[in-house]
Amino acid sequence: MGKLMAPKILVTNDDGVYSTGLKAAFDSVSDLGEVTISAPAVQQSGVGRSISIFEPLRITKTNAGGIPAYSVGGTPTDAVILGIFTILKEMPDLVLSGFNIGENISTDTITTSGTIGGALEAASYGVPAIAASMQVLDEGQKFDDPRDYHRERFEAGIKVVNRVAQNVLNYGMPENVDLLNINIPYHAEEDTPIEITRLARKIFKTDVEERRDPRGRPYYWIAGDLIREEEEGTDVHAIMQKGHVSITPISLDSTARIEFSEIEKYL
């Protein structure tokens, strides 16, 4: 009787190949199979599922916190595409994107997060995908580049993702689910409750800040405060108001669930 093959797991992120969150992602699945890291060379937060089609991409072998990794000069989606079609040359059994430094909750982040974008790219090929993100209390932490890895900071999230990933490998995704979006609250412990949630509508109160350069010409920063209060059952409510782990099942099919006759009256 032949030896069973270890599951192939591809790990990526959007904070860059040297982010401590990527090391946490590796640690969360390292005992579950053969893990390959293919991640952006530099910070790619906010690029969503964007893909590089007007410039060539390069892959560099590197060492990410003591782990062999592939650094891709592109977006998280590029890293997933090259990870599957150039590095692995086959479909993995699971793609894990994360751990993002900063929560990815609400419909705002589903369409803008590079962490989720990379996971969605994998899901588009029928590969089970997980996106994992850690809440920060200071929004400025999202823009830091910490490389000193302290596993205890991620321990609760590592255990949650390990358990979920093991079950996804064992049983596959539920019907009509392409991606599990996992968010870990900042103060999570091993016994922190876990909620299955739906997406809140918004997480940002979008604003634009105008400033002036030394020549008096205007330039702009897109900014905005966080929305911290939302309906019970949403990911924002679970993370921001209750401090619970949030797991949101996501589908690639964005078709509105309405009777099509409702649209025909506009024709």
From Swiss-Prot:
Pfam families: SurE. Keywords: Cytoplasm, Hydrolase, Metal-binding, Nucleotide-binding. GO terms for molecular function: 5'-nucleotidase activity; metal ion binding; nucleotide binding. It is an enzyme of class 3 (hydrolase). Its EC number is 3.1.3.5. One of its GO terms (cellular component) is cytoplasm. It catalyses: a ribonucleoside 5'-phosphate + H2O = a ribonucleoside + phosphate. Its cofactor is a divalent metal cation. It is found in: Cytoplasm. A divalent metal cation binds at residues 14-15, 45, 100. Binds 1 divalent metal cation per subunit. Nucleotidase that shows phosphatase activity on nucleoside 5'-monophosphates. NCBIfam families: PRK00346.2-1, surE. Belongs to the SurE nucleotidase family. This is 5'-nucleotidase SurE. It comes from Methanosarcina barkeri (strain Fusaro / DSM 804). The lineage of its organism: Archaea, Methanobacteriati, Methanobacteriota, Stenosarchaea group, Methanomicrobia.
